[in-house]
Amino acid sequence: MSTAAASARSALADADSALLRAEGVSKRFGGLQALAEVGLRIATGQIYGLIGPNGAGKTTFFNVITGLYTPDSGTFVLDGRPYEPTAVHEVAAAGIARTFQNIRLFGEMTALENVMVGRHVRTRCGAWAAMLRPPAQRREEAEIRARATQLLEYVGIARYADFPSRTLSYGDQRRLEIARALATDPKLLALDEPAAGMNATEKVSLRGLLEHIRDDGRTILLIEHDVKLVMGLCDRVTVLDYGKVIAEGLPADVQRDKAVIEAYLGAGHD
């Protein structure tokens, strides 16, 4: 990704075209202040990185914006509207989909069926229709299957459509999780360490997929420990340490930040 391209997308955020704005987000667990007045602004069409040492609060922030944790304080605006993360299914309906650090697929279901499950958040027919199977429900089910097939092709694993998801390679399971998240038609795709456990070749392939998703107009929030991947892929980066924001900006600027080097990158980073 060129510096000019990253700067252009960052300028969008400065022009208040933010898809997601979070301000003053705090979360405490007993005596542990997991998040302290965290704020960030993600522009539409960006890949936005959230990095920091282990225990910095990254996954806690993900869990807050996706309804798994209730924040003690803070406000959110999603796509120009006030947003309150509540139940997980309501978060998906609002337009945020996520993956987890640990893969969470239905192992005995096929790859296609896993993606179809994700698509059901956008269905119009209710439970009675699912049982009675009127023509409208059957048409919708066919549409769901077709869309799921398209998404498997999109992420590059269509040949495994009928395979149980547990039989896929680790990297392909990660791609399947992304396809399932995309099936909800999210405004914001939140990925929690998607490159964890991948080899170098798989990481290069993942980077290409995420760039493709962004270039198709999706917005991505990314937690990732692979600093090289983050700095080469993201348009902007926020760094957390002990639940606080210690730096935010273009990747090149963040890499030179003294507080970031001391807390996370290490003195030997270049």
Label the predicted regions.
Residues 2-270:
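Glycine-rich phosphate-binding loops of nucleotide-dependent enzymes
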